[in-house]
UniProtKB/Swiss-Prot annotation:
Pfam families: Cnd2. Regulatory subunit of the condensin complex, a complex required for conversion of interphase chromatin into mitotic-like condense chromosomes. The condensin complex probably introduces positive supercoils into relaxed DNA in the presence of type I topoisomerases and converts nicked DNA into positive knotted forms in the presence of type II topoisomerases. Early in neurogenesis, may play an essential role to ensure accurate mitotic chromosome condensation in neuron stem cells, ultimately affecting neuron pool and cortex size. The modification Phosphoserine is found at residues 12, 25, 67, 75, 78, 83, 91, 195, 227, 425, 489. InterPro entries: Condensin_barren_su2 (IPR022816). It comes from Mus musculus. This is Condensin complex subunit 2. The lineage of its organism: Eukaryota, Metazoa, Chordata, Craniata, Vertebrata. Belongs to the CND2 (condensin subunit 2) family. Keywords: Acetylation, Cell cycle, Cell division, Chromosome, Cytoplasm, DNA condensation, Isopeptide bond, Mitosis, Nucleus, Phosphoprotein, Ubl conjugation. The keyword Ubl conjugation applies. Phosphorylated by CDK1. Its phosphorylation, as well as that of NCAPD2 and NCAPG subunits, activates the condensin complex and is required for chromosome condensation. Disulfide bonds: none annotated. It comes from the Eukaryota.
Length: 731
């Protein structure tokens, strides 16, 4: 027998004694006084080891667990709510509770009952049933409160019901464990020398399980087959709408003209899948890397070595400079310029202009009028004004000082390769579009006095308010003719769309120069310096208008007789240049006289050159076709045709139709003799209503006859010349 330790024994003894004074353990079914070997509490004598029973470790563990659970559950409640105890001594417990503690315990029970928090864990710690007599004693002095009594009975009933459920569950838990076989435990035997012998466990061999044969053929087909609703995938509604509106007779595909691709993958997407702006991150483009230029290094070095840095100073020597050689080079350069045809002679006289120049300064030298002014067609000065030379005296020239302009700005207008008279870049001067766009206009003559009056600026008067004057307020507050409120159109225009900027989608501008199918390559942007280097307009020669391509393919642009274009005869006067209108055969015929040179000559001949005339316009021919679909009641058409085939009257045909609609089938009818389709069509014109008779055609009648042949077992045969169809009853 194992001897227990003294510390364990003493602790277990003290703990057992301390708990027994307050509340007994729920597993103790025997009263405390019936325990053998227990010393009374009042004994001053020190307990002897022989007086105590054997120590039970399992019981101590259970007591420690219950005390820990009790502390966790009732930490906020009164200290007198003890651990669950089903065999509690009511007389000893009630005597130790004061009236205040009983009142607190009563309020706690009522609160838990109202909140429905009475469970199996705290049901045995609530002593409302045990304190019922004490509560009634306290309430005897007061009149009976039925509301308090009802709440007390309700809480007591809940506590008792939960206790019964807990006992019932424990009993079934114990009964469930009775039928189970406990595993065999190894028995320990102590030998005389203290060695322990353990018996080996005998393991029974596991029996092989028999495989049960089951049917693999499913009898219910609904468990195997998938329903049609589950088999159909989700169809895009836009796809259904587009497919429904597809015309099978059209030459274009159903989706090729409407679907679009979004990115470089060229994947066709439906409109519902399209994204206006991509919300994802941009694709990372692969690095193009660097190009190896080591092979070109040797050839580039050879080009640099052979060329001088400054060709104009190639022969100049700092230490061996000679004035004679310098003068010779300068004289040679001067002779070169003198031999040039375009040498500017300062002492030369100015050439006189044959045309008259209007006196006085010019007003509105440039008028921003893009359209030609045809109202003053008779004024010769209007059409030769663009050829006039602007002669401005030296004293009227406006001199721009360098202080007002930056040298860097002025250099941007200069040409990269200036000539003797072309210092500015033609690209900059392209803003002048010529005489058709900008035209010089003569300035009207003004008197000297009027010029001086315009120069004088009117002095600006200071704003003053005189508070002494009498103000007529009626003039300011009288009802005016002008509207004082905003009109409806003004309010509609001044809406939030007119004053609010569009939504900024933060679109990447780099996508504009990015190729669609090859996003790795981009369009190069040329700087202004590179553009200026590539623009060598000075090296381009004048265009030769007399080249064979233009002279052979020239089209005079002949005008038709009903043309709206009319030109005044005085527009082509002598000052600008005489134009022979009689050279155009079309114009000579309109004027009423034909020159003998043009008689008998084709109108396409113009100055002994065979030219292609303007093609003739084809008259617009309107083709009549059916622009709207024909509507036909096929059911009524079939009834009328069947009545004609069976020689029924119209009234009998209607009665038969009513019988068939109500579900009563009449006697089957047959075709008596042969009928022709052409005759049936003519008879149908009189039987049908006017609108249906107008829409009736041979194809519709033949389609109706085919339906009847299928339903009524008719036989159709064609004539020998295939001009008509014979209808007869089938076998």
């Amino acid at each position: 027998m194992r001897i227990p330790r003294s510390e364990t024994m003493n602790s277990s003894f003290l703990k057992a004694r301390g708990q027994q004074d307050v509340l007994s353990s729920p597993l103790e079914r025997v009263p405390p006084a019936s325990r053998p070997g227990k010393a009374p509490l009042g004994t001053p004598k020190t307990p002897v080891l022989e007086d105590f029973p054997q120590n039970d470790d399992e019981k101590e563990r259970m007591q420690r667990r219950r005390s820990r659970v009790f502390d966790l559950q009732f930490s906020t409640d009164s200290i007198h709510l003890a651990s669950p105890n089903r065999n509690i001594d009511v007389s000893t417990t009630i005597s130790k509770f004061t009236n205040t503690q009983i009142t607190e315990h009563y309020s706690t029970c009522i609160k838990l009952s109202s909140e429905n928090k009475i469970t199996t864990k705290n049901a045995f710690g609530l002593h409302l049933i045990d304190f019922m007599s004490e509560i009634l004693k306290q309430k005897d002095a007061e009149p009976t409160n039925f509301k308090v009594a009802a709440g007390t009975l309700d809480a007591s009933t809940k506590i008792y019901a939960v206790r019964v459920d807990a006992v019932h569950a424990d009993v079934y838990r114990v009964l469930g464990g009775l039928g189970k076989d406990t595993p065999p435990q190894g028995e320990e035997s102590h030998s005389g020398d203290g060695s322990t012998l353990e018996t080996e466990r005998t393991k029974k061999p596991a029996k092989p399980k028999k495989k049960q044969s089951c049917k693999t053929i499913e009898q219910n087909l609904s468990n195997i087959n998938v329903s049609e609703a589950d088999g159909k995938c989700a169809v895009d509604p836009m796809f259904q709408k587009t497919a429904a509106s597809f015309d099978e007779c059209s030459t274009t595909g159903v989706f090729l003209s409407t679907l679009h691709c979004q990115d470089y993958r060229s994947e066709l997407l439906f409109p519902s899948d399209m994204q206006t702006l991509s919300s994802g991150e941009p694709l990372e483009l692969p690095d193009l890397g660097f190009v190896d230029m080591t092979d070109l290094e040797a050839s580039l070095q050879q080009c640099v070595e052979d060329r001088p840095l400054c060709p104009s100073l190639a022969g100049f020597q700092f230490t061996k400079w000679d004035s004679e050689t310098h003068n010779e080079s300068v004289s040679a350069l001067v002779d070169k310029f003198k031999k040039n045809d375009q040498v500017f002679d300062i002492n030369a006289e100015a050439e006189d202009d044959e045309e008259d120049v209007p006196d006085g300064p010019l007003v509105e030298d440039f008028v921003d009028n893009d359209e030609p002014d045809l109202s003053a067609a008779g004024d010769h000065e209007e059409f030769r004004s663009w050829k006039e030379l602007c002669q401005v005296q030296s004293n009227q020239e406006e001199v721009i000082s360098l202080e007002d302009r930056d040298i860097q700005v002025m250099c941007s207008f200069l040409s990269m390769k200036p000539g003797e008279y072309s210092y500015f870049s033609p690209r900059t001067m392209k803003m002048w579009a010529g005489p058709d766009h900008w035209r010089f206009r003569p300035r009207p003559k003004q008197d000297a006095t009027s010029c001086t009056e315009h120069k004088k600026k009117s002095a600006k008067k200071d704003f003053e308010i005189n508070f002494d004057d009498d103000i007529d307020f009626d003039a300011y507050f009288q009802k005016t003719k002008a509207a004082t409120i905003l009109t409806k159109s003004t309010l509609e225009n001044q809406n939030w769309k007119a004053t609010t900027l569009p939504t900024d989608f933060h679109y990447e501008t780099d996508n504009l120069i990015q190729l669609h199918l090859k996003p790795g390559k981009r369009s190069l942007k040329m700087d202004q310096d590179q553009k200026a280097k590539t623009e060598h307009y000075e090296e381009i020669e004048d265009y030769d208008y007399n080249n064979p391509n233009d002279t052979s393919n020239y089209c005079p642009g002949l005008q038709a007789a009903d043309s709206d274009y009319e030109e005044a005869d005085d527009l082509f006067a002598d000052p600008v240049g005489t134009l022979d209108l009689e050279s155009d055969p079309k114009t000579t015929q309109e004027n009423g006289h034909i020159s003998p040179e043009n008689q008998g000559v084709d109108i396409t001949t113009y100055q002994e050159l065979n030219l292609v005339a303007e093609p003739q316009k084809v008259n617009k021919i309107e083709i009549h076709y059916a622009k709207t679909a024909k509507k036909m009641d096929m059911k009524k058409l079939k009834q009328s045709m069947w009545s004609l085939l069976t020689k029924f009257s119209r009234k009998e045909a209607d009665t038969e139709a009513n019988h068939t609609e109500s579900g009563q089938e009449g006697a089957p009818e047959e075709v008596a003799d042969e009928k022709k389709l052409s005759g049936l069509t003519k008879d149908l014109q009189t039987r049908l209503p006017p609108l249906m008779a107008q829409n009736l055609s041979i194809p519709l009648a033949f389609a109706c006859l085919l339906h009847l042949a299928n339903e009524k077992n008719l036989k159709l045969e064609g004539t020998e010349d295939l001009s008509d169809v014979l209808v007869m009853q089938g076998d």
